[in-house]
A protein has these predicted regions:
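Auxiliary Fe-S-binding modules of radical SAM enzymes
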Residues: 1-24, 255-333
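Flexible, acidic/Gly-rich N-terminal and inter-domain linker regions that tether
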Residues: 1-85
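Conserved Radical SAM active-site core
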Residues: 62-85, 100-194
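Cysteine-centered iron-sulfur cluster-binding motifs in ferredoxin-type domains/subunits
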Residues: 89-99
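Structured alpha-helical segments in the cores of large, soluble enzyme domains
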Residues: 125-131, 181-183, 213-226, 316
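Conserved radical SAM core fold
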Residues: 143-146, 177-180, 191-211, 236-240, ...
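Short, electropositive alpha-helical surface patch
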Residues: 152, 193-196, 243-259, 285-292
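Conserved C-terminal portion of the radical SAM core fold
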Residues: 216-276, 324, 330-331
Length: 333
């Protein structure tokens, strides 16, 4: 039987950030860890012939400095929620969870996690943009900041930064079930906490290491009760056996705990992914049902065949609209 190291048993640290305060803070929180100095994070992260599926069982941590910028315009497959100046930020690369369908598996060459400790430079880059226009920024697309908050403290820092900049609204998206954070952080109406919620069957089969759906629902309620605007993301919807029953039960579970009228909004969308990402994922995960489904290729993006996609999305809109006004339900198009 294969024996894996524990998560973050090995930490690679760029020589240029060994004395950075955040590097020291992170290393102080890790026990029984082997620390290895490197010249550049890409020496480890971008090595050829890495197996992301194998690394998911024993992720290494890489502490690095971002020197090329972290703020990007939003991608076509992502929802802007009607916001004009839509950007996302990569202050981390990769996620401690292991969702089989996640596009990160196709985008990155490694399953290891990179944390850019020079958050102050990312804030400076963002301030230059904010001097020109208002910004809607997703800060947790390429990682789950909430899930690793005890180690990095980035969520706290993003909230504090946003409170100081009135023309900035951020979204922090997560599959973490942590409830303890929100009561300890001062709420801001421009910090949207977004929870991705899936049916129990989908979570059990494909969302490895992520918090259980009911734990995410409880955490979303905690965030709402603490004064944060909360977004629920039923996205991506995953086609599975008895999908109608699975998603119907999930909606019932959600709105038995959460008052839909108090939600900031809701996101609905079926699974879609870049053709290049899926090609790479299929090579790495030949036995994954969700990765190897016979999707349709529409203009370079794989998605469910039209009959499946429209049935799932229309079903979900109808189910959610019993609890949430339709003008607060957003669809990916």
């Amino acid at each position: 039987m294969c024996q894996y190291n524990k998560m973050f048993s090995h930490v690679y640290v760029e020589k240029g950030v060994t004395e950075h305060s955040r590097t020291k803070q992170i290393l102080e929180k890790l026990n029984n860890t082997t620390v290895i100095e490197i010249d550049h994070y890409k020496d480890v992260f971008c090595r050829k012939k890495q197996s992301i599926s194998a690394q998911s069982n024993a992720k290494a941590l890489i502490l690095a400095e971002n020197t090329s910028g972290c703020i990007y315009e939003g991608a076509p497959v992502c929802q802007s929620f009607g916001n004009e100046n839509f950007y996302y930020c990569s202050c981390m690369m990769n996620c401690i969870f292991d969702c089989e369908y996640c596009y990160l598996k196709g985008m990155y060459p490694s399953g290891n996690l990179v944390v850019f400790v020079n958050l102050e430079d990312i804030f400076a880059e963002l301030e230059a943009l904010l001097a020109q226009k208002s910004i809607y920024l997703c800060v947790s697309y390429d990682a789950d900041l909430v899930a690793i908050e005890l180690l990095t403290g980035f969520v706290r820092e993003w909230i504090a930064f946003t409170k100081k900049h009135e023309n900035l609204t951020i979204e922090i998206r997560t599959k973490s079930g942590r409830c303890d954070l929100w009561s300890n952080y001062e709420a801001c109406d421009r910090v949207i906490i977004a929870y991705t919620v899936s049916p129990q069957r989908v979570a059990a089969e494909y969302e490895h290491f992520a918090s259980a759906p009911m734990e995410r629902i409880q955490a979303a309620k905690c965030a709402m009760d603490s004064g944060f605007p909360v977004r629920l993301c039923f996205d991506p919807m995953i086609y599975c056996k008895d999908w109608r029953g699975e998603y119907s039960r999930m909606v019932g579970d959600v709105f038995s705990q959460i008052d839909g009228s108090k939600l900031w909004d809701v996101s609905i969308g079926s699974f879609r992914i870049s053709q290049d990402y899926l090609k790479k994922m299929r090579k790495d995960m030949p036995c994954s049902a969700v990765v190897n489904f016979p999707y349709d290729n529409v203009n370079g993006y794989y998605q469910y065949p039209e009959n499946i996609r429209s049935d799932m999305e229309e079903f979900m809109i109808q189910a959610v609209s019993e609890y949430v006004d339709k003008d607060r339900i957003f669809m990916w198009k």
